[in-house]
């Protein structure tokens, strides 16, 4: 919760690659089911992207999520510093309630004054394209609410089970992949 004891109305996810694309895609696709704060995604090192996002938000009701596997990615760190400065310029109290970090490098995170209880850690071995199923999915959880997020995870588990247990001729991911290969290599379609 923000310092004013109300609920956050906005969440800014600062990340790039897998720390941005997956959560951004899912929150966009599931927008009709949102039951939480509005999520904004900033990945561009061009400061105009972040400034355009910040100008319409109330820092008192905004949570900044800094998502970076290594916490050394220049685009993410540059935007994170700017967002932290924005909070400091507008809030007279400690900004720690308005910051969380998601990273596999907690040592680096702590250099930014983010305490252990505000860090969601994940294994360095988790690849970017799969990270939305773990802590990187925090913006999805916040946007959807706990119940709908658990339904989302349950659906993913069902598809995993389907993939591992169905015969090839009944296996939807395999059939889609084979159809894609057929369209591209045999039919010579230039797009999917």
Residue ranges, per PLM feature:
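A glycine- and small-aliphatic-rich helix-loop capping segment at beta-alpha/alpha-beta transitions
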Residues: 21-36, 56-58, 78-88, 113-119
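Cofactor-/ligand-binding subdomain signature composed of acidic, glycine-rich
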Residues: 1-9
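Glycine-rich oxoanion-binding loops at beta->alpha junctions
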Residues: 1, 26-28, 32-63
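Conserved beta-strand elements of the Class I
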Residues: 10-14, 63, 100
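Active-site phosphate/pyrophosphate-binding segments
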Residues: 86-192
């Amino acid at each position: 919760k923000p310092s004013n004891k109300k609920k956050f109305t906005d969440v800014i996810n600062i990340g790039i690659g897998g720390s941005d694309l997956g959560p951004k895609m899912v929150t966009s696709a599931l927008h009709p089911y949102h039951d939480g704060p509005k999520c904004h995604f900033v990945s561009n090192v061009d400061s105009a992207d972040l400034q355009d996002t910040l100008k319409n938000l109330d820092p008192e009701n905004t949570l900044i999520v800094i998502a970076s596997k290594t916490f050394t990615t220049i685009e993410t760190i540059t935007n994170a510093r700017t967002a932290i400065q924005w909070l400091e310029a507008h809030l007279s109290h400690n900004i720690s309630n308005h910051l969380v970090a998601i990273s596999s490098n907690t040592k680096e995170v702590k250099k930014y004054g983010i305490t252990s209880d505000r860090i969601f850690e994940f294994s360095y071995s988790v690849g970017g394209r799969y990270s939305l199923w773990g802590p990187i999915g925090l913006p999805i959880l916040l946007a959807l609410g706990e119940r709908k997020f658990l339904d989302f995870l349950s659906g993913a588990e069902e598809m995993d089970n389907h993939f591992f247990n169905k015969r090839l001729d009944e296996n939807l991911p395999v059939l889609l992949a084979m159809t894609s290969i057929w369209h591209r290599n045999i039919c010579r379609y230039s797009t999917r």
